[in-house]
Amino acid sequence: MPTILVSALETSSNVHLEELRRNLPKDYRFIGVFEGSGALYSPREFSVMGFRDVIGRLGFLFKVYKEMIQLAKQADMVLLMDSSSFNIPLAKKIKKQDSHKKIMYYILPQVWAWKKWRAKTLEKYCDFLGAILPFEVSYYQKKAQYVGHPLLDEIKYYKKDIKGETLVFMPGSRKSEIAKIFPLFVEVARILEQNEGFKRRVLVVPSFFKGLDLKALYGEGIEWFEISYDAHKSLFEAEFAFICSGTATLEAALIGTPFVLAYRAKTMDFLIARMFVNLHYIGLANIFYNALNDETPGLGESQLHPELIQHFLSVESLIRAYKDMDRERYFKESLKLREYLMHGSARKIASEIAFLLNLT
């Protein structure tokens, strides 16, 4: 039975991993960090935000790092997904420990945004680099291949027009995000019900919150919303969405749902991030839309959807974005973005895993 050491610390990575596993033979055994039986740790134990939060958990992260290095000895190959701050040092250590160990990196770090030197590091220590964006490959020498975007494996609903019956609210999956964004969304929902007559307001809740006390997690105002655990279906049925920054923004764009990105970080974290990452946009859909228009990703002039960040984010600005958005233009351009990303990646990655295992 082939054994694969997996390091998938992000919630979104585990959604992609689930689709990948459907395309692999049943007898493959997974060990490491992922969501599911047999995991050493769940990704929920890594949901920290901000520089100070990470510093406070360095002891735990170093413990996991050492355990993963030991686990690698049992594995036939290694699959690293996203989370470059953890996974790049892990790749280096595992390769130095066993130079013959095959390492695949799927969902590459955003070297086009910052720390471009990481591309050379990945080339040196990994055997296959699975790029999910067409323009990423140009930042690497020879080991990177464009494999398609995993969201196009997972999304089953695509709009044929911009009609919808609901307003969808997605305030993030981390408690720190929810605390900052959800109160604004509650007020927006109240105002739009009064002024626009919307009766159906849907709060999309991460599936791993099932069984938890949602009132304790979200606080006052949750009674204003219908609860949904199906983001894709909810976005498909929506007339408009209010979304905290993250993978959900790209999901909305691919489905074709008009939306506004809302994000507010701790002031110190935001200032530190700005020192290292100089981007006009933080939304994945806008970043990819720049590339689609032959502009530098994240630094172009073209914009698919509005972004309201830090002090620009308020109840008033959210409502203004809802009212002012050119929905017809957005929908037409979102179809171009869907075509740009073309196809999913699970089947391609599964075949590459089988190929690497045959080399061991």
Curated annotation (Swiss-Prot):
Tree of life domain: Bacteria
The UniProt record lists the keyword Transmembrane helix: no
CC terms in the record's Gene Ontology section: membrane
Keywords: Glycosyltransferase, Lipid A biosynthesis, Lipid biosynthesis, Lipid metabolism, Transferase
Classification via InterPro entries: Glyco_trans_19
Keyword Zinc set for record: no
GO BP annotations listed: lipid A biosynthetic process
Pathway: Bacterial outer membrane biogenesis; LPS lipid A biosynthesis
EC top class, as a word: transferase
Molecular-function annotations in GO: lipid-A-disaccharide synthase activity; phospholipid binding
Reaction catalysis annotation: a lipid X + a UDP-2-N,3-O-bis[(3R)-3-hydroxyacyl]-alpha-D-glucosamine = a lipid A disaccharide + UDP + H(+)
EC number: 2.4.1.182
Family the entry assigns: Belongs to the LpxB family.
HAMAP family in the record: LpxB
Role description: Condensation of UDP-2,3-diacylglucosamine and 2,3-diacylglucosamine-1-phosphate to form lipid A disaccharide, a precursor of lipid A, a phosphorylated glycolipid that anchors the lipopolysaccharide to the outer membrane of the cell.
Protein known as: Lipid-A-disaccharide synthase
Species: Helicobacter acinonychis (strain Sheeba)
